[in-house]
Amino acid sequence: MAKLSLINREEKRRKTVEKFAAKRAALIAQINDFKLPEEERMVARLKLQQLPRNASPVRERNRCALTGRPRGVFRKFGLCRNKLRDLAFRGEVPGMTKASW
């Protein structure tokens, strides 16, 4: 089980990303619009740099929904490999069967 503080920090990041998503998208659109003068694009770059670091979606980390484990997380299920295996063996994951060939 991951420390509760790390799980809460990740949740706080997720909320920050959601809060600034529209503003970031607008600034990035300005930066990539080559029809605008260079000065306006530079101002947009500076405004983007002024946003909080945690507003960037790259800083988000996928964590297991049950344990908070940061590594080996399957996106489709939102679970780490260990818990996914346990639940699959108990038959609690619909459509998942043990491989045999």
From Swiss-Prot:
NCBIfam families: PRK08881.1. The lineage of its organism: Bacteria, Pseudomonadati, Pseudomonadota, Betaproteobacteria, Rhodocyclales. The keyword Ribosomal protein applies. Part of the 30S ribosomal subunit. Contacts proteins S3 and S10. InterPro entries: Ribosomal_uS14, Ribosomal_uS14_bac/plastid, Ribosomal_uS14_CS. One of its GO terms (molecular function) is structural constituent of ribosome. This is Small ribosomal subunit protein uS14. GO terms for cellular component: cytoplasm; small ribosomal subunit. PROSITE patterns: RIBOSOMAL_S14. Binds 16S rRNA, required for the assembly of 30S particles and may also be responsible for determining the conformation of the 16S rRNA at the A site. It comes from Aromatoleum aromaticum (strain DSM 19018 / LMG 30748 / EbN1). It comes from the Bacteria. HAMAP family: Ribosomal_uS14_1. Pfam families: Ribosomal_S14. Belongs to the universal ribosomal protein uS14 family. Gene3D superfamilies: 1.10.287.1480. The keyword Ribosomal protein applies. Keywords: Ribonucleoprotein, Ribosomal protein, RNA-binding, rRNA-binding. GO terms for biological process: translation.
